[in-house]
Amino acid sequence: SKCFSPGTFCGIKPGLCCSVRCFSLFCISFE
């Protein structure tokens, strides 16, 4: 399954961000 890159909208499926977290509906990096 594909995962989302930083900056990708994740409001619908917040658990699919690649090595990033969902914040304010967008994937962001931990750095």
From Swiss-Prot:
The modification 4-hydroxyproline is found at residues 6, 14. Keywords: Disulfide bond, Hydroxylation, Ion channel impairing toxin, Knottin, Neurotoxin, Secreted, Toxin, Voltage-gated sodium channel impairing toxin. One of its GO terms (molecular function) is toxin activity. It is found in: Secreted. Expressed by the venom duct. PROSITE patterns: DELTA_CONOTOXIN. InterPro entries: Conotoxin_d-typ_CS. Disulfide bonds join 3-18, 10-22, 17-27. One of its GO terms (cellular component) is extracellular region. Belongs to the conotoxin O1 superfamily. Delta-conotoxins bind to site 6 of voltage-gated sodium channels (Nav) and inhibit the inactivation process. Potent paralytic toxin in vertebrate and invertebrate systems. Its binding appears to be voltage-dependent. The presence of a 'disulfide through disulfide knot' structurally defines this protein as a knottin. The cysteine framework is VI/VII (C-C-CC-C-C). This is Delta-conotoxin NgVIA. It comes from Conus nigropunctatus (Black-spot cone).
